[in-house]
Amino acid sequence: MRRPRRRLIAALVVTAALVVVPALAYAATTISISGATASFPLIELLTNRYHNLKSGKVVFKVSQGGASVGISDAAAGKVSIGDSSRPPAATDPTGLVFYPIAKYFVCVVTNPANPVANLTAAQVAQIFTGKVRNWSQVSGATATGPIDVYSRTSVAGVLTTFQNTLLGGSKVSSVATQEASEGLMQNAVKKDPSAIGFLSDYFALAKGISTVGYNGTGCSVANVVAGTYLGVSDFYEVTKGPASGPVEAFIYWVQSSAAAKKIIQSNWIPLGKIEPAVQG
């Protein structure tokens, strides 16, 4: 990163502001962010911490909508940063840079009234593609009757992660009820004893949700760190071209500071090392 040059430019701008328009010297910088609902709890914690660290001189406007929405907003220049819970895709606009900031994982989940200890990869595929539609066909299930399958909408990066890592590249059946956010999916599964869905770790490990093992491996931080659980992906900060100025400073802080790492470790998984940006 162009750290020395950036600091020099910043120093010159501040000096000019002090000389020409003193009142503007303390104007706050606004960084706008939109995108993934899965990463929103993490981004909220990180931006609040950074805002306080900068004594209020950096202000964040954060909105949700889904990973693809954040990516599109960043490409269109509508926001400073797009939050993504999936890696770059061939269909994404050109010129984007994806900066990985943390790892997360996806769990198959059910209602606590129907705790299912484990499903094989074949069972997960059969249920979510609509080939198995009744709980009586699922060993270990206590529920009987039709399976209520829940999914995320097409803009969700968590859907991409689930399909690519736990569904073998297959698509979730169109009969599934689609939820627009992780919070809505979580609430739907909590309320429906016949439900099965998938959630990112922050929402899956919350009270009122039962996680399902995959091929004999529990969906847990320990198994992800050990490399035995498959449903893992990264959260990304996405910018139109290489990040610069205050946006670059924020992303660098997220990727490198001890304070950010501590926040990430609270509910997510830090990157093993600072990885280079992925050019989309």
Predicted feature locations:
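Short linear, low-complexity motifs centered on an aromatic residue
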Residues: M1, A23-L24
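Bacterial N-terminal signal peptides
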Residues: A11-V21
